[in-house]
UniProtKB/Swiss-Prot annotation:
Family: Belongs to the DNA repair enzymes AP/ExoA family.
CDD domains: Ape1-like_AP-endo
Name the record gives this protein: Exodeoxyribonuclease
Catalytic activity: Exonucleolytic cleavage in the 3'- to 5'-direction to yield nucleoside 5'-phosphates
Gene3D superfamilies reported in the protein's UniProt record: Endonuclease/exonuclease/phosphatase
Amino acids binding Mg(2+) 2: D145, N147
Needed co-factor(s): Mg(2+); Mn(2+)
GO biological-process terms attached to the record: base-excision repair
GO CC terms, sorted: cytoplasm
Active site: Y106, D145 (proton donor/acceptor)
Chain residues that bind Mg(2+) 1: E36, D242
Entry note: cofactor: Probably binds two magnesium or manganese ions per subunit.
Gene: exoA
Amino acid sequence: MKLISWNVNGLRAVMRKMDFLSYLKEEDADIICLQETKIQDGQVDLQPEDYHVYWNYAVKKGYSGTAVFSKQEPLQVIYGIGVEEHDQEGRVITLEFENVFVMTVYTPNSRRGLERIDYRMQWEEALLSYILELDQKKPVILCGDLNVAHQEIDLKNPKANRNNAGFSDQEREAFTRFLEAGFVDSFRHVYPDLEGAYSWWSYRAGARDRNIGWRIDYFVVSESLKEQIEDASISADVMGSDHCPVELIINI
């Protein structure tokens, strides 16, 4: 099974910059998960051939939002995590299949000065609780923009960014707790020591050209699936957003 996750930072903007349908066709992934779609119902007429499409919209216009394109029709689709205060921003879609749950997640940014860190920690706790409930039923593949660089190897300038949003002790510890609860960062499972592998670059100062980036987009899978991971990769050559797609090949 081939899965792709991409924070598009505005789907309409990406569709203006590239032939998005051709991209989907060329990649020929079984499942494609998008984050930060920034659209409302009816704003995009997009029905790729051979895919079932599911959208979760934020209440606030032009903000957040997720989508999943799946070749196989799921047994059920769950929008959000069942906690009203966390389900206003369209951040989670879960697809249930016979042998696995597939989730797309767009984790809230803690913002400059960590002004939203308290909410972020509440989100982390609620999300992990939800994931663990799913994992008791069948294994989970979670992907998306998790807005955290877990270790120093996961960003270009760790010392300069210590305790900035995305590299605070609280956020990194929350991700550690997630993994310790029985999950695997697929990219580090395959490439434990690979440096310079990033999925997001600031638009400022030519950061992408100089590869001054962060790895904040992930595929995280249940521990029981780790031996079925065949490859995990980052498609840094795909333009259109400040993030690039990340990919997982897994034997399901």
